[in-house]
Every structure is written in C-alpha cells, then in structure tokens.
C-alpha cells in the first residue's frame, strides 16, 4: 500500500482499497447476465426460439422493474448493511443465471428478467455509490470514484472476451452451436457473479454504512432538494447520457436484422 500513500491517498482509503476495487468489479459483472443477450443477439434468439419483439420485452421489463426499484433502493441502502445488500444482489443475480439454464418459456423468461431488474438495480447501485463514499477518506472521495469507474471498465474489458471464449468453447463441444454456446456463456456469467458476491461479503467492511437518525432524510428534505435547479440539470444530463448508452445496445440487433436473414418480426 506504499504506492497508494505516494499517490496521496488517506489511511482509510488505503485500508479499504481492495474492497473498493471488488465493489467496482461487481458493478460491472452484475450486468453481464441481464445484458448478454444483446452481445449474442442472433444466437440467443435462435437458442430460445424468440422473436425480436419478445427480446425487446425483456429489456423493457428489466428497465421498468429497475425504475421502480430505484425509488426505494437508496432508502434501504441508508438503513441496511451495504455489505449484505451488495452481496445478496450479486449472489441473487448469479443464481438467476443458473435458473436460466432450465428450459424456460417466454413468460418464465419475462419473470426472470423482472427478477434481475430487482436484484441488480434495487439497492445495488445506490449501495455501490455509498460504498465508495464510506470506504474512502474524506479527502479521497473524488479519486476513489475515479478508481471505481476505472476498475469497472477494466473488469468489463476482461469479462467480455472471456465470455466470447466460453461461447466458442460451447460451439466446439456440441453440434448445436447456439444452444451449447449460450449455455456456456450463461454458466460463465453466473459463476463469476456469485463469486464476486462472495468476495464482497468476505473483504468488505461495514464501517459507517448506516446513518444516524439525525442524518435520515425527511420528505421536507426531499422537497428542498427538488427545488434546486442544479438537481434537474444533473438529472437531464444523466438521462441524455443513458439514452445514448442504451441506444448502443440496439446497434448489434439492428445490424444483424439488416445484414442477415431476420430472426422474426
């Protein structure tokens, strides 16, 4: 940790640096299962006999449940152990991946994506943000968020090619290429998601994760915040950013539909 000291990080940040990186990795890994079908769109559609519309429903239901969950996740993150919430979110999402290995029909898949919308968004993201704050020294919060976002990117860069290798391994192992490849990808994402949850449970501390009664937010406080113009500007910027980011996920299916035989309308 001498290197971290040379970088000017405080004692608390140095002590919890590994935990911050594990939370960051989990913040990337947990979304592998809900979103992997965009990366393997055609193979996923063929393996599970899905239409383009049905796959679109998965994204919609995941987003709706996530939006509802966000309304309550922050409240829960202030009152329950963030270590426990992060671990349960990761492990629950991973177990959902193992359920995906069963021969599920369309309504059952909709229920699964609804479940993922709850486990990966409900308290997970508010807990990620809070974890970085409580694990960092007061003077290091900006640097810690930088390390957090950077580690998320590194985890994603490592995870994605490994998933491709898993898919390729499945294609070589079975004549039913798409089905076997998809199963290998699901197993890969499920295992690393559960493993990530166990690592967070093992390495993370709960110091300062619960707020005192004097710090609890009231409806009057919420009203005060909502009257701040800066809050609405930040919300608009965030909305525009996510619209662009999520639009990227549709490039793959759209290009496949136009350059190859369509799956089904």
Show where each model-derived region lies.
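Juxtamembrane intracellular "pre-TM" segments in multi-pass secondary transporters
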Residues: 2-13, 207-233
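Extracytoplasmic
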Residues: 18-43, 50, 248-253
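Extracytoplasmic gate region of multi-pass secondary transporters
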Residues: 37-39, 230-256, 260
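Central cavity-lining transmembrane alpha-helices of secondary-active solute carriers
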Residues: 60-74
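C-terminal ends and interior cores of transmembrane alpha-helices
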Residues: 91-105
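Cytoplasmic helix-loop-helix junction between adjacent transmembrane helices
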Residues: 115-151
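Glycine-rich segments within core transmembrane alpha-helices of 12-TM secondary carriers
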Residues: 145-168
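C-terminal membrane-cytosol helix-exit motif in multi-pass small-molecule transporters
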Residues: 190-210
């Amino acid at each position: 940790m001498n290197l971290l000291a040379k970088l000017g990080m405080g004692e608390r940040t140095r002590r919890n640096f590994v935990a911050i990186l594990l939370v960051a990795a989990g913040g990337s890994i947990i979304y592998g299962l809900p979103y992997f079908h965009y990366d393997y769109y055609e193979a996923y559609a063929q393996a599970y006999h899905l239409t383009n519309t049905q796959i679109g429903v998965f994204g919609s239901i995941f987003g709706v449940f996530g939006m509802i969950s966000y309304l309550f996740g922050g409240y829960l993150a202030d009152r329950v152990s963030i270590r426990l919430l992060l671990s349960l979110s990761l492990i629950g999402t991973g177990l959902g991946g193992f359920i995906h290995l069963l021969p599920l029909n369309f309504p059952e898949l909709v229920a699964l994506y609804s479940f993922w919308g709850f486990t990966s968004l409900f308290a997970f993201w508010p807990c990620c943000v809070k974890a970085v704050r409580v694990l960092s020294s007061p003077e290091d919060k900006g640097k810690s968020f930088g390390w957090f976002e950077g580690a998320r990117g590194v985890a994603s860069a490592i995870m994605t090619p490994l998933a491709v290798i898993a898919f390729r391994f499945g294609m070589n192992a079975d004549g039913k290429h798409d089905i076997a490849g998809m199963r290998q990808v699901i197993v890969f994402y499920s295992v690393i998601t559960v493993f990530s949850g166990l690592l967070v449970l093992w390495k993370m501390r709960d110091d300062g994760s619960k707020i005192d009664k004097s710090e609890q937010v009231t409806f009057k406080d919420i009203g005060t915040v909502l009257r701040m113009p800066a809050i609405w500007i930040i919300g608009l910027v965030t909305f525009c950013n996510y619209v662009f980011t999520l639009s990227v996920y549709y490039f793959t299916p759209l290009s496949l539909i136009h350059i190859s035989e369509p799956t089904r309308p």
